[in-house]
Each structure stands twice: as C-alpha cells, then as structure tokens.
Amino acid sequence: MIYAAEEVRARFARRGLSFDPTVEEIVRGILEAVREEGDEALDRFSRDLDGYPVEEVPKRAWREAYEDLDEDLRDALETARERIEAFYREEARGGFLRAEGGGVLAQLVRPLERVGVYVPGGSAPLLSTLLMTVVPAKVAGVREVIVASPPKVHPGVLAAAWVAGADRLFAMGGAQAIAALAYGTGRVPRVDKIVGPGNRYVVAAKRLVYGTVGIDGLAGPTETMIIADGSASPRLLAADLLAQAEHGPDSEPWLLSPDRALLERVEAELSRQLQDLPRAEVARQALEKGGLVLTKDLEEAFALANLYAPEHLSLALSDPLPWLEKVQNAGGVFLGEGSPEALGDYIAGPSHVMPTSGTARFQGGLAVRDFLKVIPVVGLSEGAARELAKKGALLARAEGLEGHARSLDLRR
C-alpha cells in the first residue's frame, strides 16, 4: 500500500518504546529471586524456562566449534572481525593532559573492567551479534567480556566467541541471565555494563537493572527506512525491504520517495519476490507494519525520516553524499545502492546494534565509547586556585551553600 506523507506523519511523531506491565512484573520476580538466592534461583529458572541448568562453556569447545566450521564461513568471520576492529580502532583514541596556569587540566579515558554481552538464541544463530558487541568492547580495552546465550548454545555462536576474543561464555538466557550478570552469583561474576539485544523479557530486565549496572539501550523490533529517487532499482529496493522484513512480524520496513511510478514498481516487485522467500509469511506481516510513502519531494522525505528516527536509513539516490547533511536522526546511514543495510548487518564495519523505536533522536549505535568512561582531573596551581576562588565563592553563596564558599575563601 502506498501512503501519502500526511497519513504517516502523526504516527511517526508519536513513536517510542512501550513496556508491558505484565512482562515487567514477571521479570521483577525473576530479578529479585536471582539477587537473593544466586545460583540456586538461576538454575531453577534456567531449567524451567530453557530446559537446562546454567553451565559455563569452556574455551576448548569454542575452538573446536571454530575448527569445525566450513572454511569459507571461518574466513567470513575473520574478515568481519578485522573490519569491525579497524572501524573502531580510530574511535578508541582519546583523553588529554593540558598545562593550565602552572597546574594541569586533564581527561582520563578508562575502559570498563567487565562487560556482559547478551546474544539471543532462537531459530537463527546470531554469530554477527556476538562479533558486533564483543569486538568493540575488546578494542576499547575491556579486561573481561562475558557472553550469555541461551542453552544449548549454537556451535556458530561458540565459534564467533573464539574469533571475537570473548573471555567467558555461559549457557544461560532470558531475564535470569540479565539478573546473574547484573547482581553476580557464585558462578557468574557481576559486570559493570550489559549490552546486546533480546526479547521483551530481556529488554524489561535490562531496564529494571539499569542503575545497578549500565546498559547500552533498550532495543525494540528492527526497522529500516529507505529514501529513493527515480534512479533507484525497484528490484534492489524490494530486496532490501524484504531483508529487514524477514527479521520478524514486528519489523518496520519503509520506503519514501517523491516518484510514484517507482513506488508502484517496487510494490509489484515485492509481490514477486515474496513468492519464493522462505520467511514470506513473516515478511508479509512486517510489510503491513511499514509501507511505501509518496512525498512531495526529497526534502519532505528527509523531514519525515528525521521525525521517524529510524534504526537504519538507506539513501538510494543518484548522488547521496550531498544529502547526508540533511540527516539528523538515524542509528546508521547507508549511502547508495552499493551499500545495502544487509552488509551493515554482517561485515561492513560498524556495529549493527543500533537504536530503535525512535530512540535515535537521543542515542547512537553501539561503539567503543559505550565501553569507556571519562574521568576529569583538576590540578590547579596555588596562584590559579587563588584567582578562581573569589568567583567560585560568589557562585556558591548565590546557591546558598556557605560551606562551599568558606572552603574557597580559605584558598584566597
């Protein structure tokens, strides 16, 4: 179905994360039990919900899984890791030390000590998710990266853990895994931050443990938005929309264009390609969540995209680079038909863990900075302190904090 821009504008404007109170109540009980009872509760929930007790998978099993992989798949994993490392190595530089009036002002950049990475289970092994979370953490210098993935852990996930350089891996999933990482148990160490996507129980658990540990964000269903002009290929556009639609029935694939003829050709192409797509029924449901939108021009298309704040924004334009300055809100941007979002999912370089549900308005994708903390350092000389103390005391008294002011008066 082709929508007019006005039909979707209000829907785009009110986007945001929503939470099921019933799910949160269930998750709250799991978190409390694991915090109070530790491994006993962790194993109980794991048996009840996943059918197996929690176990740590030894590194020899990772290596064996890696060695058992098809040679081409091993090479693809290695290439993906190398590209992710190269992309984030540039960001890892930081901090400064500056002389200041006989003293120093500095900014220390320090990696987190221990990070938990959640890798979902399910019908498809998410090898790429493990690479996209563990590798940036290791580039940042995180000392220990602990992976949690539901039992039985797929051999491909174990192989990816070996390639990415993870430190430990526990076969545990769901809210109970988040609880174990957040609070620590006898077997599972407490981490400083938890990253990675998951189902609604995992998302609810991350939301509830925030403050006890850090989190990367709260992920909803995946979404992609393509802005296209008449130069774009309907066949490629349809394929790119279906690549995201097959993720799940709640995915949202959108195509925005001022070219009605293009939208009509894409609509026909979607019907054709759906005929032999293995996950066609899932993709059909997702296409109903999204749609094709006719805009008056490209300017309106970009205004709608910024309102929607998509996880993925693809610019299928004859000359996409000049339009990049119009992008304000997006998790990641893919320029031209030669840079499909599916490449970003696996091997382009940036992490595919990106903000969803409109949170790209205030949050970026997972990166090295998510595994770093900044510590300011102030070391003023006696002369500089004396010079600043009078003005500092004035500010303190304006706030009604006499103790602060007196501390500064003694330096004058």
UniProtKB/Swiss-Prot annotation:
EC main group: oxidoreductase
The protein's annotated pathway: Amino-acid biosynthesis; L-histidine biosynthesis; L-histidine from 5-phospho-alpha-D-ribose 1-diphosphate: step 9/9
Gene3D superfamilies assigned: 1.20.5.1300, Nitrogenase molybdenum iron protein domain (3.40.50.1980)
Reactions listed under catalytic activity: L-histidinol + 2 NAD(+) + H2O = L-histidine + 2 NADH + 3 H(+)
InterPro entries given in the database record: Ald_DH/histidinol_DH, Histidinol_DH_CS, Histidinol_DH_monofunct, Hstdl_DH
GO BP annotation list: L-histidine biosynthetic process
Keywords: Amino-acid biosynthesis, Histidine biosynthesis, Metal-binding, NAD, Oxidoreductase, Zinc
Protein name: Histidinol dehydrogenase
HAMAP family: HisD
Catalytic residues (positions): 311 (proton acceptor), 312 (proton acceptor)
Annotated residues for binding of NAD(+): 118, 176, 199
Cofactor remark from the record: Binds 1 zinc ion per subunit.
Family: Belongs to the histidinol dehydrogenase family.
Native source species: Thermus thermophilus (strain ATCC BAA-163 / DSM 7039 / HB27)
CDD domains: Histidinol_dh
One Gene Ontology term, aspect cellular component: cytosol
Enzyme Commission number(s): 1.1.1.23
Database matches in SUPFAM superfamilies: ALDH-like
Role played: Catalyzes the sequential NAD-dependent oxidations of L-histidinol to L-histidinaldehyde and then to L-histidine.
Residues that bind substrate: 222, 244, 247, 312, 345, 399, 404
Cofactor(s) the protein requires to work: Zn(2+)
Domain of life: Bacteria
A GO MF label: histidinol dehydrogenase activity
Binding site for Zn(2+): 244, 247, 345, 404
